[in-house]
């Protein structure tokens, strides 16, 4: 029985590890090393009790019966023959199921019998459940998806950020905000990789104890990166809304305020969360959020920022529709607003509106929530990089110009041929740099994305 239970327990702990990696919501299972720590503590306590039994004077019936036993799960005291011994479910199984039950062994002339009923069933942990098998496979696929998503997003964001930083003609307020947004997505991807490496690189119990301070610092950094990313998405929505709603708007004047909102406000809330967590829920590595009131210190501002962005989205659509219907609007400006509407419609749904949908979702919708938050959310940076940089007409024409200059320097006698269709096809959210510069003098709100 013990030989068959050990691989089952290993499989159970593996699933527990995957569950912990996938979710950061209230009520998720404990970490694998926490379970193993409890198991080793129970073992040490049991061996101490059995040692006391051996040193003490055992009765004649007990001496001729079954000797005390630690079976790698439960502690069985010494017993007289022909008796049934009852013990409670192991604590590490209670951590997984919260179901209290009893286990039994018979003391026979040949020694201890097998444990009955099966510990996993008696304690509410059904290892052979087909639902657990499906969930295990689902979480493995989910891990692959969000790893690929964050990796591809990180690569594309680094390229996009280097492009915007390299060309001085692209340096303007809107692109400065875009670059800050790119950095926030880069930090979000890196923080996920660092968190996984720190939390799950080792399952040894001593690792959990020795790296508690560093582990908590990693979680503080992780939470800050998540909040900063949502804050810069809010800044993007606020910037678009302000440009459309206010007639005279000094972009450079408010850039410092945007930077303070994007990087400063998350630091305040994360600091409050860390202080609250230290005094009210200073357990583990701060990766399990069992206290809902503490978790709302971070969760509340994130949901509020998404709600505000959604309001901006509705109002931006209202303003755009009103401007497009105005007969006095010139044709060139109408084209600009159409491109703006297209870019806005592509951008605003990426602000995390799905987070509100699943913020109060029931437990049976957890897998769908994890899919949207981890799998699809990990590709968010990739989509934003494509929308803000690679599909931007100004960026494309600057890259084309740089390529022409390099080609003329390397091959001065070979003409450079560019199809006119390239400029027409790639003229994304904005016109060329020269055209947009000239038009921006008369239409300051034309090129926003």
Swiss-Prot record:
Q: What is the effect of changing residue 36 to A?
A: Strong reduction in secretin (SCT)-binding
Q: Which residues lie on this side of the membrane: Extracellular?
A: 26-141, 196-216, 277-291, 357-367
Signal peptide coordinates: 1-25
Report the locations given in the UniProt record: Cell membrane; Basolateral cell membrane
Entries under SMART domains matching the protein: HormR
Bias category Polar residues: which stretches? Answer: 425-442
Question: Origin, by domain of life?
Answer: Eukaryota
* Molecular function per GO: G protein-coupled peptide receptor activity; peptide binding; peptide hormone binding; secretin receptor activity
Disulfide pattern? 46-75, 66-107, 89-123, 215-285
Q: Where are the transmembrane segments?
A: 142-167, 175-195, 217-239, 255-276, 292-315, 341-356, 368-391
Database matches in Pfam families: 7tm_2, HRM
UniProt keyword Acetylation, yes or no: no
Q: In which tissues is it expressed?
A: In the brain, expressed in the central amygdala, hippocampus, area postrema, nucleus of the tractus solitary and cerebellum.
GO BP annotation list: adenylate cyclase-activating G protein-coupled receptor signaling pathway; adenylate cyclase-modulating G protein-coupled receptor signaling pathway; cell surface receptor signaling pathway; diet induced thermogenesis; G protein-coupled receptor signaling pathway; intracellular water homeostasis; positive regulation of lipid catabolic process; regulation of appetite
- Please provide the record's keywords in A-Z order: Cell membrane, Disulfide bond, G-protein coupled receptor, Glycoprotein, Membrane, Phosphoprotein, Receptor, Signal, Transducer, Transmembrane, Transmembrane helix
Q: Which residues are glycosylated?
A: 72, 100, 106, 128, 291
Q: What is this protein called?
A: Secretin receptor
Which source organism does the UniProt entry give? Rattus norvegicus (Rat)
